Design a protein with these regions (language model features):
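Catalytic histidine site
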Residues: 1-37, 127-129, 174
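Short, small/polar residue-rich loop motifs at catalytic or cofactor-binding pockets
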Residues: 3-6, 143-147, 219
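Conserved catalytic-core segment of clan PA serine endopeptidases
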Residues: 4, 25, 29-86
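Short beta->alpha transition motifs characteristic of CBS
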Residues: 20-23, 144, 160-168
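Chymotrypsin/trypsin-fold serine protease catalytic domain
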Residues: 72-142, 172-173, 181-186
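Catalytic nucleophile loop of clan PA
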Residues: 141-162
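C-terminal cap/linker of serine protease catalytic domains
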Residues: 163-193
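Extracellular adhesion/carbohydrate-binding repeat motifs centered on closely spaced tryptophans
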Residues: 192-236
C-alpha cells in the first residue's frame, strides 16, 4: 500500500532541518518512509527551491524500538540535505539553558495539510501552559500537517518539536529539547558539519565547523570578503 504524508520542519543549520520522527517512521505501518522530500519556503504560488530529496534521516533508536505511546518523548528527527539551502532562508538556534518554560510565549510556524494540494505557511503564538521536562503543552492553533514544526522562543531558539494534538481539550504538545535529546542533536550536527566553500543559487559561502564565515577571511593565503549573510562579494 502506497501512502503519502505531509509534515513540517525547520532549519537549525544550513543543511539540517529538525522535525518529528513520526513523519518518517510510523508505528502503525512498522516501517520508515521509502523517500522523504522537503520543499523549502514553498507557497501556494511558487516553489522557490523545488522539491529536494533528503539525503539522510537521523532519529533516536528508542522511537522505533518502543511502543508508540512510550516512544512519544523521543519523537524528533533530523533531516540532512546534500546542499545548504538554509543559507538562503535563515536558521533557528538551539536552547542555551534547561530552565522550566511554563509561562513563556512560544511561536509555531508550519504547513497544515487541511488541503493536501495547497502549501500555505501559518504562524501562531501562545504561552506555554506546562513544562514537565519532557513535553511542553500549549494552546497554539495547529492542524494535521503541523507535526515537526519547531516551537521557538522570542530569541528564535528551538525549545521543542510539535508532535501531538488533543482536539477535545484544545491542548497541543511538543517534545521538549532537553538533556536527553540535545546530545543526540549535537552529535548529528557534528557528524554532518559543513566545511569549506559551498555554492548556493549562484553565490559562494565559506563554512568552518558548520558556521558561515563573514567579513574579511584569509583562506588558503587569499583574502575574501563575505557579507553579513556569508555571501562572497570579492572575486576569485
Amino acid at each position: 500500500m502506497n501512502v503519502e504524508g505531509r509534515g513540517s520542519a525547520n532549519f537549525i543549520k544550513d543543511n539540517v532541518l529538525i522535525t518529528a520522527a513520526h513523519n518518517y517512521y510510523r508505528h502503525d505501518y512498522g516501517k520508515e518512509a521509502d523517500d522523504i522530500y522537503v520543499l523549502p519556503a514553498v507557497s501556494p504560488s511558487q516553489e522557490l527551491f523545488g522539491k529536494i530529496k533528503v539525503k539522510e534521516v537521523c532519529y533516536l533508536k528508542e522511537f522505533r524500538n518502543l511502543n508508540s505511546k512510550d516512544a512519544r518523548e523521543y519523537d524528533l528527527a533530523l533531516l540532512i540535505l546534500e546542499e545548504p539551502i538554509g543559507a538562503k532562508l535563515g536558521t533557528l538556534g538551539l536552547p542555551t539553558s534547561q530552565k522550566n518554560l511554563t509561562g513563556i510565549t512560544v511561536t509555531i510556524t508550519g504547513y497544515p495539510s487541511y488541503n493536501f494540494k495547497i502549501h500555505q505557511m501559518y504562524t501562531d503564538k501562545k504561552q506555554v501552559l506546562s513544562d514537565d521536562g519532557m513535553f511542553l503543552d500549549y494552546q497554539v492553533d495547529t492542524l494535521e500537517g503541523y507535526s515537526g514544526s519547531t516551537v521557538y522562543d522570542a530569541s528564535h531558539r528551538v525549545v521543542g518539536v510539535h508532535t501531538l494534538g488533543d482536539g477535545a481539550n484544545q491542548i497541543n504538545s511538543a517534545v521538549k529539547l532537553n538533556e536527553r535529546n540535545l546530545p543526540f542533536i549535537y552529535s548529528v550536527l557534528k557528524g554532518y558539519s559543513l566545511e569549506g566553500w559551498k555554492k548556493i543559487n549562484g553565490s559562494w559561502y565559506h563554512y568552518r565547523q558548520h558556521d558561515k564565515q563573514t567579513g574579511w577571511q584569509e583562506i588558503n593565503d587569499t583574502w575574501y570578503y563575505l557579507d553579513s549573510s556569508g555571501k562572497m562579494l570579492t572575486d576569485w
